């Protein structure tokens, strides 16, 4: 722990096209080997496809809705008490919520069956915006796990 207090969190830069810090975080999370221009190209093309498939709704609104729908409210953390391990449900703070949602959307996009990351990402974002898709299923699984272990909530620390 630092002796001089907490370090202030830097405000992330906004995305050059949409002016959204969330979009920039998404691109940074999607980037491999420092190839940001490649990640941006994939993201922007996916957003174009998302707008085409989205039924007239703006792509950035659909994107924000998808991330919002994928954010978990609760998760379980393992806590050791008296030789036994308990899955203790805890609330997820706002920054972690966003990063988990982004991480899940990207990983489940990569795992989809379509050809090309642009199509995979566009379809996963569209599914998440409509309350379907693998990222939403993951969120529901995490919530179900927290609900099942509600009896151990008093072990929170």
Swiss-Prot record:
InterPro entries in alphabetical order: Ribosomal_uS7, Ribosomal_uS7_bac/org-type, Ribosomal_uS7_CS, Ribosomal_uS7_dom, Ribosomal_uS7_dom_sf
CDD domains associated with the record: uS7_Bacteria
PROSITE patterns reported for this sequence: RIBOSOMAL_S7
**Keywords linked to the UniProt accession:** Ribonucleoprotein, Ribosomal protein, RNA-binding, rRNA-binding, tRNA-binding
Keyword tRNA-binding included in the entry's annotation:
yes
Question: One GO term of the cellular component aspect?
Answer: small ribosomal subunit
Q: Which GO terms describe its biological process?
A: translation
| Key word RNA-binding present | yes
Molecular function terms, GO-annotated: rRNA binding; structural constituent of ribosome; tRNA binding
The record's comment on protein family reads: Belongs to the universal ribosomal protein uS7 family.
Record's PANTHER family? RIBOSOMAL PROTEIN S7
Subunit record text: Part of the 30S ribosomal subunit. Contacts proteins S9 and S11.
Q: Name the job this protein performs.
A: One of the primary rRNA binding proteins, it binds directly to 16S rRNA where it nucleates assembly of the head domain of the 30S subunit. Is located at the subunit interface close to the decoding center, probably blocks exit of the E-site tRNA.
Q: Which HAMAP family match?
A: Ribosomal_uS7_B
Q: What is this protein called?
A: Small ribosomal subunit protein uS7
Gene name of this polypeptide: rpsG
């Amino acid at each position: 722990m630092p002796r001089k207090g907490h370090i202030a969190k830097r405000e992330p830069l906004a995305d050059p096209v949409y002016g959204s810090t969330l979009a920039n975080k998404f691109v940074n999370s999607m980037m491999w080997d420092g190839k940001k221009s490649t990640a941006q190209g994939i993201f922007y093309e996916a957003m174009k496809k998302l707008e085409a498939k989205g039924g007239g709704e703006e792509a950035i609104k659909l994107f924000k809705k998808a991330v919002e729908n994928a954010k978990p409210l609760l998760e379980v953390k393992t806590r050791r008490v008296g030789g036994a391990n308990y899955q203790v449900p805890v609330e997820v703070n706002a920054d972690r919520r966003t990063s988990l949602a982004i991480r899940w959307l990207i990983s489940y996009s990569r795992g989809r069956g379509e050809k090309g990351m642009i199509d995979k990402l566009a379809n996963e974002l569209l599914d998440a915006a409509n309350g379907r898709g693998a990222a939403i299923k993951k969120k529901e699984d995490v919530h179900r796990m927290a609900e099942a272990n509600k009896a151990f909530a008093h072990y929170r620390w």
